[in-house]
């Protein structure tokens, strides 16, 4: 684990950082780098709606190509599915020996969608939290833990540069963990698919369907399997599974011990292993690339199918009753 005393901020202060993208992480990195005294510019395509936001913050914005030409450290924070094209068209033609190419996620490098030249440092700085939290913690004098990894190190100074960058966005205040592009990418994808997004979503929808098909009102089913999920996750987030079990009733705890293994059994574990193998082998990324090359048709079809599930209809009606819940723009428009 690395902390403030392990990182030299002057290293990144002596470089010119170009941040490609201004989404959740892009804005947090750019603003915090600026506040740490680092020269920073943001690369966005012509016509991007985010250009005005960058300019309002007093940061210079230009096209990705021009920013890549100016910078000697380029942090790629565009969406995963856009990175390979941006690299090929805008970044690679402007890379110079001694430049550093940084990423917030290792997918494109690990699976060979981006192949940087050998004379460029390739590293990753990945905060383990959303951009708004990264920025808020930085402003409060704190930080969000970060992962760093060095995939290519022609100068032998890649780790020091990555640590310096992490310090500039507040990461070393909380702690920085050294990893590899392989481990960060594969664990991140597995967590998303098997548990956080895919697994949780299907568990919730299936629980809802079972209750409604058994004759219970959909409103009650929604409260029990989706709405109250936040209460449980918050307890786990604060103090782990033990804290959650301590906080719920004995009835809930006892029932969970008995029934949880009936839902998630050895067969589930084997299917999770199959998902991990698909990730490790590159099969998932091949499907991801095929979807993008096909115009996102598969993704759009899956979105439509999920949006039409009855739990979404029920949920929208119930959230109209919850003044304390922040409503997404799509529901309030």
Swiss-Prot record:
Its EC number is 1.1.1.86. The lineage of its organism: Bacteria, Bacillati, Actinomycetota, Actinomycetes, Mycobacteriales. NADP(+) binds at residues 22-25, 45, 48, 50, 80-83, 131. The keyword Cell inner membrane does not apply. This is Ketol-acid reductoisomerase (NADP(+)). Involved in the biosynthesis of branched-chain amino acids (BCAA). Catalyzes an alkyl-migration followed by a ketol-acid reduction of (S)-2-acetolactate (S2AL) to yield (R)-2,3-dihydroxy-isovalerate. In the isomerase reaction, S2AL is rearranged via a Mg-dependent methyl migration to produce 3-hydroxy-3-methyl-2-ketobutyrate (HMKB). In the reductase reaction, this 2-ketoacid undergoes a metal-dependent reduction by NADPH to yield (R)-2,3-dihydroxy-isovalerate. The active site is at 105. It holds the Pfam family KARI_C. Residues 1-179 form the KARI N-terminal Rossmann domain. InterPro entries: 6-PGluconate_DH-like_C_sf (IPR008927), KARI (IPR013023), KARI_C (IPR000506), KARI_N (IPR013116), KARI_prok (IPR014359), NAD(P)-bd_dom_sf (IPR036291). One of its GO terms (biological process) is isoleucine biosynthetic process.
């Amino acid at each position: 684990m690395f902390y403030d005393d392990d990182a030299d901020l002057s290293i990144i202060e002596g470089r010119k950082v170009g941040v490609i993208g201004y989404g959740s992480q892009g804005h947090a990195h750019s603003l915090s780098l600026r506040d740490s005294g680092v020269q920073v510019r943001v690369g966005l395509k012509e016509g991007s709606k985010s250009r005005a936001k960058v300019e309002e913050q007093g940061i210079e914005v230009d096209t990705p190509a021009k920013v890549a030409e100016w910078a000697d450290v380029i942090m790629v924070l565009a969406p995963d599915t856009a990175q390979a094209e941006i690299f090929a068209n805008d970044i690679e033609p402007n890379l110079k020996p001694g430049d550093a190419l940084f990423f917030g996620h290792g997918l494109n490098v690990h699976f060979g969608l981006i192949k940087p030249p050998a004379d460029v440092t390739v590293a990753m700085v990945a905060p383990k939290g959303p951009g708004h939290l990264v920025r808020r913690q930085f402003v409060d004098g704190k930080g969000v833990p970060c992962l760093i990894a060095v995939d290519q190190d022609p100068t032998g100074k890649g780790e020091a540069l990555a640590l310096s960058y992490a310090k500039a966005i507040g990461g070393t205040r909380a702690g920085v963990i050294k990893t590899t592009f392989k481990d960060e990418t594969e664990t991140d994808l597995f967590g998303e698919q098997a548990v956080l997004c895919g697994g949780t979503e299907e568990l919730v929808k299936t629980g809802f369907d079972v209750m409604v098909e058994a004759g219970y009102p959909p409103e009650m089913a929604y409260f029990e399997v989706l709405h109250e999920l936040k209460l449980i996750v918050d307890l786990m987030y604060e103090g782990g599974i033990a804290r959650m079990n301590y906080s719920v009733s004995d009835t809930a705890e006892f029932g969970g011990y008995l029934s949880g293994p009936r839902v998630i059994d050895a067969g589930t574990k084997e299917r999770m292993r199959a998902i991990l193998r698909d990730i490790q082998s590159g099969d998932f990324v091949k499907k991801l690339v095929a979807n993008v090359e096909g115009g996102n048709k598969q993704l759009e079809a899956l979105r439509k199918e999920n949006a039409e599930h009855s739990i979404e209809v029920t949920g929208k009606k119930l959230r109209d009753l919850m003044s304390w819940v922040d409503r997404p723009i799509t529901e309030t428009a």
